[in-house]
């Protein structure tokens, strides 16, 4: 299972993601691609992101049962805590430089 959530991305990237995944809500895509296709899809996100941000989560053989990666500016920062991936939240001013 793969889930990608996007914010403030160009319409062409949203259309591109809809080629391989189902957009179940604005900016939320799900599917069950192979690892190779998942990596290709993420490359498309990296190339088309512009000023937006995205997160991709997928099922895998880890202790938590999933893994994820992020791209772009947002308040959520992935951290590794004893082999478990967690999310740390930054204060709003750390993202934009202002309150």
Regions found by a protein language model. Name each.
Residues 1-99:
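Basic nucleic-acid-binding interfaces
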């Amino acid at each position: 299972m793969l889930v990608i959530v996007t914010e403030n991305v160009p319409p062409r990237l949203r259309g591109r993601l809809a080629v391989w995944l189902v957009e179940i809500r604005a900016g939320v895509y799900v599917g069950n691609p192979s690892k190779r296709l998942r990596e290709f899809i993420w490359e498309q996100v990296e190339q088309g992101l512009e000023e937006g941000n995205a997160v991709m989560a997928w099922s895998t053989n880890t202790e938590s049962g999933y893994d994820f990666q992020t791209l772009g500016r947002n308040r959520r920062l992935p951290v590794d805590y004893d082999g478990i991936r967690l999310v740390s939240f930054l204060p709003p001013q750390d993202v934009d430089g202002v309150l």
